[in-house]
Structures are given as C-alpha cells and as structure tokens.
C-alpha cells in the first residue's frame, strides 16, 4: 500500500515548482523508483511534427517528478501533512497524521 496514490492532492516541496498544489494523475513504479505525474505541475514544452492524425505545433505536457519531491496536501486544513497507516475493523487504512482523518 503506497502512501501517495492516484487522485491524491499533493504539494511540491522542492524544485522550480515549489509550493504548487495539484492532483496526482498517474504513479509509475519502475526500477525501484516511484514517479508521480501531477496535473498542471512540472510542465515542459514539446515540439510535435504534423502527421495525418494530428496537427503539429508546440504543446505543454506534464512530466513525471520524483515522489520524494511531493507531500500530501490536506485540502480541508490547507496544510501539507504526512500519511500513516492504522487498522480499522481489521482493515488497513491510510490516515492523516495531523488531523487523524481516515482517507480510505
């Protein structure tokens, strides 16, 4: 069970996008690394040649950032927080350490 999963609100804690809040679009676990693709954060521009199906041009795309550079963002309290695990009715669930609110 991962601490940050798709659909979570996260805040970027390091890098040029520090302080930006976004929603995790996709998690990629490959080669022992975990990368998070966050909506509207870490944008880069890509030049695409025209083809039969698509026009060419310069597009902004989201790139993956390392999961160590993001933290869970509690949208109710408006602060970043850590995520922990506990057992509720024999089921392992994620909870916010700052408020104790159960996520799953």
UniProtKB/Swiss-Prot annotation:
InterPro entries: KOW, Rib_uL2_dom2, Ribosomal_uL24, Ribosomal_uL24_CS, Ribosomal_uL24_KOW, Translation_prot_SH3-like_sf
Species per Swiss-Prot/TrEMBL record: Anaplasma phagocytophilum (strain HZ)
Subunit annotation: Part of the 50S ribosomal subunit.
Function summary: One of two assembly initiator proteins, it binds directly to the 5'-end of the 23S rRNA, where it nucleates assembly of the 50S subunit.
Similarity comment: Belongs to the universal ribosomal protein uL24 family.
GO MF, one annotated term: structural constituent of ribosome
Taxonomic lineage: Bacteria, Pseudomonadati, Pseudomonadota, Alphaproteobacteria, Rickettsiales
Protein name in UniProt: Large ribosomal subunit protein uL24
PANTHER family (alphabetical): MITOCHONDRIAL RIBOSOMAL PROTEIN L24
Superkingdom as given in the UniProt entry: Bacteria
HAMAP family per record: Ribosomal_uL24_B
Keywords: Ribonucleoprotein, Ribosomal protein, RNA-binding, rRNA-binding
